[in-house]
Amino acid sequence: MKSELDSCRVEPALEVLVGRWKLSILYFLFHGTKRFSELQKGIPSITKKMLTSQLRELEEQHIIRRVVYPVVPPKVEYSMTEYGKTLEPILELMHKWGSDHVKYMQLNRNSQVTNNVME
């Protein structure tokens, strides 16, 4: 007999998206093809090792495409696959929810401070 967790399809989605930097990487790639150095500049806190690791995982999941050009110096570009582009509406909703959540928390933090002062 299947448990409710067995039928939960959120888990496979989270396996693809969870990673400290994956959502930031996807955000930049939804705005166009990027080179490694462009991604690193866009996410200054990420190390080269971590960026490489996160890019590899996304590539293995067919979310992004890595293209190596046979030139000197080496040129590598990353872009969204057609399959990866199906995540865009989900990420847009997550972005909106995150923005709303920040505003909500700020409002509630301010009212909490006001309540504490009045006590």
Where are these regions (language model features)?
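N-terminal amphipathic alpha-helix
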Residues: 1-20, 93-94, 98-102
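Amphipathic alpha-helical dimerization/coiled-coil segments
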Residues: 27, 85-119
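Alpha-helical DNA-recognition elements
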Residues: 57
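Glycine-centered, phosphate/nucleic-acid-interacting loop/turn motifs that mediate DNA/RNA or nucleotide
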Residues: 62
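Short beta-strand "wing" residues that participate in macromolecule-binding interfaces
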Residues: 66
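Basic, amphipathic "hinge/linker" alpha-helix immediately C-terminal to the N-terminal HTH DNA-binding motif
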Residues: 70-93
